[in-house]
Amino acid sequence: MGTRVAVAGASGYAGGELLRLLAGHPDLELAAVTGGTSAGKLVTEVHPNLTGHPALLGQAFGTTDAATLGDAELIFMALPHGESAALAAQLPGARIIDLSADFRLGDEAAWEKFYGVPHAGQWTYGLPELPGAREKIAVARTVAAPGCYATTSILALAPLLAAGLAAPDDIVIVAASGTSGAGRSPRPDLLASEVMGSMSAYKVGGTHRHTPEIEQALTEVIRGSSPLTGTAAVVRGVSGGSPPLTGTAAVDTSVTISFTPTLAPMPRGILATCTARLAPGVADGPDPDATLRAAFADAYGSSPFVHLLPTGQWPVSGAVAGSNGAHVQAAADIHAGRAVVVATTDNLGKGAAGQAVQIANIMLGLPETAGLTTLGVEP
């Protein structure tokens, strides 16, 4: 018998992906599955891709309430923003992983500016690849899973900022997302005739809700950074760059980003192109590309899910589809004096359900890779 887990809000895309991963997990046992307006329907009626798995045979969605979920040892919440906070308040003492934004931000003013509802508080931030994050997740009772754009962008930029290779106040992110990132509710702008063969920008001008989340996480990376060790330190010793900020400079430094999301004609995936002004001295080194890549090799060399691609190979969103993997690549644009980093994830995988399972594995002391894969689906 494995750990009994429940999924609240399993009728959406992220919730359905959670069910797919949990059904095949060697150490987790599905208990309650709830689905809001889908309550009473068979899981396989809403998610026909799950047909035939014994763990879901005859399983119907229950109502999303504390009584239905309370017997689980761990609860995944894949609910709309606002609903998670309300439900969590009814489950004191429960171990919860929340896939919504309700508990990601610590700044009350930023939360209310971007979400327009009262701040519910902040939980442990669940991006395991951040410095010290695994240790915090392992002892946490409640964890806020990061957003999809945030996950991809933070993975792309954190190594540069931690190593002092880029300016924290001159960062531009343009990221494309598949349509599943907008959820399952029908909308005219998500109709096939509107999306196929076309791309569009939205939430332009710094208004996307993942903006403060990205800034918060990257600011904490800078304020908690320490001098590099290993390969990156050796390369930087030759190539130059600014030392990681320490003392008052680190405490007073905040990250500012310009973030523009775009909608791409694909069902799933995130491709983030991130640029940042190079720190003084980096462009003058003998091999600026190697300097940047060394920071990523140092940060993710032991990561089971984040992979620095070989020199000259750039991330392709389809390569991580259906997986919990993330691919990154970095190069120096000497002409513009900027670092260029491209990263890709599956917005339903590492950007949502896969990452939630990764968090659960860490919380429960299981192998971090249990029930997960880095192998994408091709084509």
What are these regions (language model features)?
Residues L263-P265, T345-G351:
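Glycine-rich phosphate/pyrophosphate-binding beta-alpha loops
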Residues G12, H81, V117, G121, ...:
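Electropositive phosphate-/nucleotide-binding environments in soluble metabolic enzymes
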Residues D27-A67, V174-A175, T179-A233, G237, ...:
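C-terminal substrate-binding/catalytic lobe of Rossmann-fold NAD(P)-dependent oxidoreductases
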Residues M1-V204, R223-G224, G230, G247, ...:
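N-terminal Rossmann-like NAD(P) cofactor-binding subdomain of oxidoreductases
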Residues E17, L21, L155-P159, E213-A217, ...:
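Alpha-helical scaffold segments in soluble metabolic enzymes
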Residues T344-N347, V357-P379:
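C-terminal lid/capping helical subdomain adjacent to the catalytic/cofactor pocket in oxidative enzymes
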